[in-house]
């Protein structure tokens, strides 16, 4: 829950479902994570199948514990390994672990554009999986019409739409 009345915050960017009481939720973007790893991870090859990805060490994000299972299910693959592997809390931690050759992580490409561009991370299997949740700008109803917040909201929604 958002405690806007008890803090000085005017808004929050939230990944989840819309519909928090007393707030307006403005859709920003869906999340489409893809498998990423170091190009030098042992066993990795270009153009791998989901079945081949299942044989590599998997890196898990603790806040999305079923992500690999859902990704494999969307690819039609059943593997007991979908719930195994090192668990990390943040996408930045997953990205660094993947760069350090600790395994394959599921990360939305928009969060690792630089790493993909410079080759420190690759996507050996480009199959993405749309998340059932999305990113939203959450604004308390009583602050929604403030000019500065309206300007920020319009800019942020425009940027998210342009870069989605």
Annotated model-derived regions:
Residues 80-123, 130-131:
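Hydrophobic hinge/microswitch elements
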Residues 36, 106, 138-140:
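Short hydrophobic/aromatic beta-strand micro-patches
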Residues 23, 123-126:
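Short beta-strand/turn micro-motifs at beta-sheet edges
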Residues 21, 42-43, 105, 131, ...:
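Alpha-helix N-cap/loop-to-helix initiation residues
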Residues 1-59, 63-87:
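Acidic, Gly/Pro-rich loop/turn segments at junctions of secondary structure
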Residues 4-5, 53, 96-101, 116, ...:
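Hydrophobic residues within well-ordered alpha-helices
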Residues 126-164:
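A late-sequence structural motif
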Residues 40-41, 111, 143:
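Short, well-ordered alpha-helical scaffold segment located
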């Amino acid at each position: 829950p958002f405690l806007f009345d008890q803090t000085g915050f005017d808004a929050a960017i939230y990944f989840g479902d819309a519909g928090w009481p007393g707030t307006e939720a403005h859709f920003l973007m869906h999340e489409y994570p893809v498998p990423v790893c170091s190009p030098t991870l042992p066993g990795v090859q270009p153009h791998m199948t989901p079945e081949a990805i299942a044989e590599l060490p998997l890196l898990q994000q603790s806040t999305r514990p079923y992500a690999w299972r859902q990704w494999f299910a969307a690819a039609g693959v059943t593997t007991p390994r979908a719930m195994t592997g090192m668990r990390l809390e943040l996408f930045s931690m997953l990205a660094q672990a993947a760069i350090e050759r600790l395994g394959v992580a599921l990360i939305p490409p928009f969060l690792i554009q630089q790493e993909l561009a410079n080759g420190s991370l690759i996507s050996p299997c480009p199959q993405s999986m749309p998340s059932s949740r999305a990113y939203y700008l959450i604004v308390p109803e009583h602050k929604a019409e403030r000019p500065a917040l309206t300007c920020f909201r319009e800019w942020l929604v425009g940027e998210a739409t342009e870069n989605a």
